[in-house]
Amino acid sequence: MASKKTRDDVIAFFETLTARRFSDAGKALNELRGKNFGNQEFKDGYIMALEGLLLSSRTGDDRDFYNRAEFETQKALNNYKKEFRSFAKEDINSSYDTGFFQAWSDLIQYRSDNRKKS
């Protein structure tokens, strides 16, 4: 992540997405599109993942991972976090792939952190 402000905007996106406030999530996503992530290809992958999350959440299609994933247990969240971090760190990935999987990893981390708070 390029800056604390960018990180705050990502968190705002996750907050509004999980609260199913899709209009606000779309606005947060638009803010992120204007941010500098340091690497354009990484940013493109990251933003594409966020767009997919928003679309998947809006449609509620249970064929999508986001809509059928187990986000309620810490064990499941830890497993997802491990998998997505592993994908993001693979040397064979392009910067785009790394950005894509990093967005998912950040979402899982956000869900995990908020689960611990409640």
PLM region spans:
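Intrinsic-disorder/low-complexity detector
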Residues: 1-118
